[in-house]
C-alpha cells in the first residue's frame, strides 16, 4: 500500500482508499513522494516523504461534520508550510481544513524548533538593565521637579491675581458684582426673584 502508481488516481482493491501522486514543480526538494489517503470513514491522511525525513498530517472528521483538531507533524517549517498550502481534498464540502488547524500545526512546529535558553537570558538581562535605567532616570527627574515646586505664598499670589482678573472681566461683561452679590448699572438690568 506504500507504493505509488504512476497513474493520477488509483483505486485499491477491496477498499475505498484512494492514493494520488502529486506533481511537484520544485526540483530543489529532490522530488518527494506525496500521497493522499481517504476512506469512507471520513478520515484524511496526508504524508510527504523523501530520503531526508518523513512528514505527515492526519485529520479526522467526526460524525457531526466538525473536524477534530488532531494534527501530528514531524516537518520542518518549509515542509509544514508546503503541506498547509498544497493539501488536496477529493471532496471539498466533506473535508475542509480550518485556518485554526493550520496555525496550530505551524505553531507546534515552531515550538519544537525553539530558541536556546542562553539567547533568551541575554536578551532579558539587556532589557532589564534598560528598564532599570529608565526607571532611575524618571525618579531623578521627578525629584528635580519636586525641588523646583513653588511655595505656598507663590501659589496664593498666582491664584489671587487670576481671581481678580476673572472678577473684573465678569463685572465688565454682565454689570454684576459677584463678590458683594449686587447688580451694577450697565447694559443688563437685574431683577431679583423671590421664591
Curated annotation (Swiss-Prot):
PTM statement from Swiss-Prot or TrEMBL: Ubiquitinated by SCF(FBL17). Ubiquitination leads to its subsequent degradation, thus controlling cell cycle progression.
The record's similarity note reads: Belongs to the CDI family. ICK/KRP subfamily.
Low complexity bias: where?
Answer: 37-50, 68-80
* Residue list for modification Phosphothreonine: 151
Q: Does the keyword Phosphoprotein apply?
A: yes
The name this protein carries in UniProt is Cyclin-dependent kinase inhibitor 7
> Origin organism of this chain?
Arabidopsis thaliana (Mouse-ear cress)
Q: How does it assemble?
A: Specifically interacts with CDKA-1, but not with CDKB1-1. Interacts with CYCD4-1. Binds to FBL17.
Q: Which domain of life is it from?
A: Eukaryota
What is the recorded function of this protein according to its Swiss-Prot or TrEMBL entry? Binds and inhibits CYCD2-1/CDKA-1 complex kinase activity. May target specifically CDKA-1.
Amino acid at each position: 500500500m506504500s507504493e505509488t502508481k504512476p497513474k493520477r488516481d488509483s483505486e485499491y482493491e477491496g477498499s475505498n482508499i484512494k492514493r494520488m501522486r502529486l506533481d511537484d514543480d520544485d526540483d530543489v526538494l529532490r522530488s518527494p513522494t506525496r500521497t493522499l489517503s481517504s476512506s469512507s470513514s471520513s478520515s484524511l491522511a496526508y504524508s510527504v516523504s523523501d530520503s531526508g525525513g518523513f512528514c505527515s498530517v492526519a485529520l479526522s472528521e467526526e460524525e457531526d461534520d466538525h473536524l477534530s483538531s488532531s494534527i501530528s507533524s514531524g516537518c520542518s517549517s518549509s515542509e509544514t508550510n508546503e503541506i498547509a498550502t498544497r493539501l488536496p481534498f477529493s471532496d471539498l464540502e466533506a473535508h475542509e481544513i480550518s485556518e485554526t488547524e493550520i496555525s496550530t500545526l505551524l505553531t507546534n512546529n515552531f515550538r519544537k524548533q525553539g530558541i536556546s535558553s542562553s539567547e533568551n537570558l541575554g536578551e532579558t538581562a539587556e532589557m532589564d538593565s534598560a528598564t532599570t535605567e529608565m526607571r532611575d532616570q524618571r525618579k531623578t527627574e521627578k525629584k528635580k521637579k519636586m525641588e523646583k515646586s513653588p511655595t505656598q505664598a507663590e501659589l496664593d499670589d498666582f491664584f489671587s491675581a487670576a481671581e481678580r482678573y476673572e472678577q473684573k472681566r465678569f463685572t465688565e461683561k454682565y454689570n454684576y458684582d459677584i463678590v458683594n452679590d449686587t447688580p451694577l448699572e450697565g447694559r443688563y438690568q437685574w431683577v431679583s426673584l423671590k421664591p
